[in-house]
């Protein structure tokens, strides 16, 4: 945990759009939101040469990245508005109330918020709140004791080399199961530990210095802690699967009996590890069976002081944002400034809102939904979703690379898609979480323990398919293959994605393309391996799967050729799922719009653009963004989403509809020869 956030202990197997959307035609300040601001256009660029800079160049010039951000785009603006205006208003109202009932949602929200703002108490307490965990580490004498201590600390979200979570069994998606796999890298992904380019080497150097500084601030006397932690994590990183390998749901499904864990890693007490975590199970689904043996050897060959220093570091970095300012500031310097290029921290008041949202998001979300998302909005979004479903079915029927047998199964899956809109139909009971106004660290521990225990209680029980993986105020959407569902929180249904006062072309290029994006995740490189019931089961003929893989591989190579920064090309294999979803979402939205206009008079030009052109302008405006080089490098190495510029421009050369809309010629950069275009869905 690099800032203060919830540690639910679950790795979400869902594909998110990473974008924001709002119910209504005005923003939080009641100012009208234009369908498309024509001042965003930069006519010094030609749409057929660089569509992003044509459509968004003006916006980029007039919207530099704020010092408190590493990226600034449409969904950052909406995220800020949701949290720092809407949630702020809700929290401010609550904190003025007297005699709040202990355990009530309002008491928990008010006191968590107050505990974050109580800087005097945080400074006075120093490291005292985390002392019990440090004493546990100090008492470790051998690997077996280290392993058990790591298990204890994992319950409150502190990272170690092996992570455990609960999710639907991919081969029996109606039942919950225990999953386990790799974890424990402070830099997030193994490429940071093995790339030899200058910028990545500098990150490692800065990381080593950061660990040294944090230990110095704590007055700990570990010898060379920065080098110790970096060296250990480098060894650990090289044992782990890459982010691309982790995308394979078949390769990463390895169910073993609990007894076999001892065979795979004989020096580690797995029964104790599971028991300490409160897990009662006879099997565990592993991401990578060989990883256990490699970790066993790494631990037994490492000096015990190295292991203690590593675990001590994990405790300190986990809670850094809740500790005195010197730790918080140094934590920000590395993880925000060095890693992402952010120049300054947000004001503490704003951070308090975000911390409360991150840890008590659902109780806050309940209040958010009541105030900002009328139930009537669900009907409109439901209609949009059904329109996309209809067009997707028509597109499947038109495919020339897929046989009738596979088309039949694809239709079954499409028909089985379910969806959630706005907010949950039922709310969890959080009243058992003890939240006080004067102990931020303990509040974090208590929320983490609640989330851990709530997850563990599901083991071996039927999946509750009404559960949400995002809060209502989240500016995002997702597809969950294990439920075969698409989910659109209330926070995502806002301009520029959905604007009731906009022309249809802008909305289809926005919200409808996002709905299509999430539907397409059900048929991307990962989602296509799950059947209509959410089970990891092949429903393709062998030849059709080969055809799909061939198309996907061509799209991978296409994105592999895009250089986002000097020396940093997009990883086509890592981003393929999102890239397929963008291409599919755009295609579905375009033909849904065309279908809606049949038999009607052609829409009038708006600002000199026809409906086809405004459709693509709608797509461009939801992704417009400025980003720091550091954040872009981080995204390229760790994120399954391509950079915003390439999400805009990337799919367009493959769409003949774009070429025709803008009257592009064969020599234009935004046009590919027909033989090089990739058309999947």
Question: Where in the sequence are the language-model features?
Answer:
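Hydrophobic/aromatic-rich, well-ordered segments within soluble, folded domains that form packed cores
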Residues: 40-61, 197-216, 576, 583-588
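Short, solvent-exposed loop/turn and secondary-structure capping segments
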Residues: 57, 62-66, 164-165, 189-191, ...
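Short, glycine/acidic-rich hinge or "gate" loops at secondary-structure transitions
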Residues: 69, 101-108, 219-229, 245-250, ...
């Amino acid at each position: 945990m690099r800032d203060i956030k919830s540690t639910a202990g679950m790795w979400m197997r869902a594909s998110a759009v990473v974008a924001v959307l709002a119910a209504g035609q005005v923003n939080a300040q009641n100012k009208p939101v234009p369908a498309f601001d024509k001042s965003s256009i930069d006519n010094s660029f030609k749409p057929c040469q660089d569509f992003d800079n044509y459509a968004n160049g003006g916006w980029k010039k007039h919207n530099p990245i704020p010092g408190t951000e590493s990226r600034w785009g449409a969904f950052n603006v909406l995220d800020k508005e949701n949290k720092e205006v809407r949630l702020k208003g809700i929290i401010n109202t609550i904190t003025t109330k007297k005699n709040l009932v202990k355990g009530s949602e309002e008491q928990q929200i008010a006191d968590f918020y107050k505990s974050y703002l109580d800087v005097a108490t945080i400074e006075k307490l120093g490291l005292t709140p985390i002392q019990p965990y440090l004493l546990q580490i100090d008492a470790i004498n051998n690997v077996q004791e280290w392993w058990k201590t790591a298990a204890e600390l994992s319950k409150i979200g502190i990272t170690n080399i092996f992570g455990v979570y609960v999710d639907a069994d991919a081969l029996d998606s109606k039942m919950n199961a225990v999953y386990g796999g790799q974890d424990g890298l402070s830099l997030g992904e193994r490429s940071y530990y093995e790339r030899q380019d200058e910028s990545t080497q500098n990150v490692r150097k800065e990381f080593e210095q950061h660990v040294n500084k944090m230990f110095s601030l704590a007055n700990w006397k570990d010898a060379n802690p920065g080098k110790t932690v970096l060296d250990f994590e480098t060894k650990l990183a090289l044992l782990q699967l890459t982010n691309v390998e982790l995308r394979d749901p078949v390769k990463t499904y390895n169910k073993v009996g609990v007894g076999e864990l001892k065979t795979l890693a004989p020096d580690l007490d797995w029964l104790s590890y599971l028991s300490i975590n409160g897990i009662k199970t006879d099997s565990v689904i592993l991401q990578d069976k060989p990883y256990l043996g490699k970790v066993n050897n790494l631990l037994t060959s490492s000096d015990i002081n190295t292991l203690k220093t590593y675990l001590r570091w994990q405790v300190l970095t986990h809670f850094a944002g809740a500790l005195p300012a010197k730790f918080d500031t140094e934590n920000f310097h590395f993880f925000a400034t060095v890693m992402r290029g952010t120049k300054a921290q947000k004001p503490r008041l704003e951070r308090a809102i975000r911390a409360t949202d991150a840890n008590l998001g659902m109780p806050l979300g309940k209040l958010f939904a009541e105030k900002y998302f009328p139930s009537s909005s669900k009907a409109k979004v439901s209609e949009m979703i059904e329109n996309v479903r209809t067009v997707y079915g028509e597109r499947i029927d038109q495919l020339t690379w897929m046989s009738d047998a596979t088309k039949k199964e694809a239709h079954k899956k499409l028909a089985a898609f379910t969806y959630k809109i706005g907010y949950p139909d039922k709310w969890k009971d959080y009243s058992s979480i003890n939240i006080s106004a004067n102990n931020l660290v303990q509040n974090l521990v208590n929320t983490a323990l609640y989330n851990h225990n709530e997850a563990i209680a599901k083991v071996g029980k039927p999946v509750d398919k009404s559960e949400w993986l995002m809060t209502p105020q989240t500016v995002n959407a997702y597809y969950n293959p294990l439920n075969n569902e698409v989910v659109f929180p209330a926070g995502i249904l806002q301009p520029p994605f959905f604007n009731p006062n906009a022309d249809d072309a802008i909305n289809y290029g926005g919200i409808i393309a996002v709905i299509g994006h999430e539907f397409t995740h059900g048929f991307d490189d990962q989602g296509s391996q799950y059947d209509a019931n959410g089970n990891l089961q092949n429903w393709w003929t062998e030849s059709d799967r080969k055809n799909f893989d061939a198309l996907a591989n061509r799209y991978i190579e296409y994105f592999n050729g895009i250089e986002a920064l000097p020396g940093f090309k997009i990883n086509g294999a890592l981003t393929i799922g999102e890239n397929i979803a963008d291409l599919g979402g755009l295609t579905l939205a375009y033909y849904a719009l065309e279908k809606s206009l049949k038999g009607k008079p052609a829409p009038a030009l708006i600002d000199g653009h026809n409906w086809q052109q405004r459709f693509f302008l709608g797509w461009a405006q939801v992704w417009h963004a400025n980003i720091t080089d550091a954040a872009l490098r981080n995204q390229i190495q760790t994120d399954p989403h391509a950079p915003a510029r390439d999400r805009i421009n990337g799919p367009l050369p493959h769409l003949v509809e774009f070429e025709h809309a803008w009257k592009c010629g064969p020599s234009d950069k935004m046009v590919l020869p027909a033989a090089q275009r990739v058309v999947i869905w």
